[in-house]
């Protein structure tokens, strides 16, 4: 059973972070390590919490990325986690998102069947901490579907006529980024080939990374709802 290393960048969202970690620990696939990278949060809980007891690797930055780059740089933070990861696979989970229990299991099965070295999924989008009693939109199948269809229509493509394809390649993703970071599972070998994420502004670093990954592998896309995305700052 191959190990999956989960990278969580975090800044001043301790309550949300604990929810994210709990959801990862509830995965049906159990060979998982969690690597938390603290972007010099000011909340004291980050420094008082017993991470070792929870079997979580922790990196505390000496300087916040805002002071290093002039803007929050999740790519830089994630790269620190990737570099110390032991897993064959790397997964990402933002500190205010959560996973549903079969996420990793389903993705690994799909990657094995197709030979793809990268996978993403659909999920739910909402505002604030996930509440299982609330109703949420599907991120791609509902929230983004018409926007993406229109983009493909403008270039004369019929690929989206029947919804999302199972395989997302470079040409497809170049039209529109429909991959949420917290849904991604990718072989570390691919990230090594592209020299990890670039130090771009948040919201740009992940899309840039996916495009570069797709020069070495296709992405198997699952329509299963495998995550909840806190879209507090999301804009179509």
Residue ranges of model-derived segments:
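The conserved acidic donor/metal-binding loop of glycosyltransferases
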Residues: 94-98, 122
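Conserved nucleotide-sugar donor-binding catalytic segment
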Residues: 75, 148-236
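Acidic donor-binding segment of Leloir-type glycosyltransferases
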Residues: 21-66
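Conserved donor NDP-sugar-binding/catalytic core segment of glycosyltransferases
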Residues: 102-152
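Short aromatic/hydrophobic "clamp" motif used to bind/position activated sugar donors
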Residues: 90
